[in-house]
Amino acid sequence: YLEHMRQLLYGHDRAEETEVVTCARLKEQFKEAAMQIAAAEKVPVVFHEDSLCGNVCCKPGPVGRAWKNVVSNAVEHTDRARGIVVRLQMEVYEGQEYLTATVRDFGKGFSEQDLIYADQEFYSGDASRHDRTHQGLGLAIAKKFLKEQGGMLCFYNHAESGAEVVCRIKTEKT
């Protein structure tokens, strides 16, 4: 597992071709993945979604893996009874239009150190998480994949409680 994650991180998995994908199709893929991950852990998921238009030029496999990493982290850290909230929308950020996929959990949120280092390779937060299941690569890989597609990964603490991770994928002008 760790070797596979390292190969993904360092670009040894580049066989997939870039393609034009509608934002509506990507939204459905993101929704389906979030439902599957949440259902596997018996965690409720609430969706807030806008009508999406336009296209993104991306490698769907890596973008999907980035999304699954983000959702898996949220499911792992949330209050299991409250679940997660997924928001899918179009957004203009710094003058560029993006397909934005946001996941909010209801856990303890990010520590100050997490906010600085969470997307860095091999960072896994507190010492209690240094085990076989946490290699500190998930958010680093998600950030790398999104950046390669002209996007970005941002994370915050929600004003009320929990963490919020935002995946932005640049849309094409139509």
Label each PLM-derived region with a short phrase.
Residues 110-123:
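Short conserved segment of the HATPase_c
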Residues 105:
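Acidic ATP/Mg2+-coordinating residue in the GHKL
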Residues 73-75:
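Short helix-loop "hinge" at the ATP-lid/N-box region of the Bergerat-fold HATPase_c
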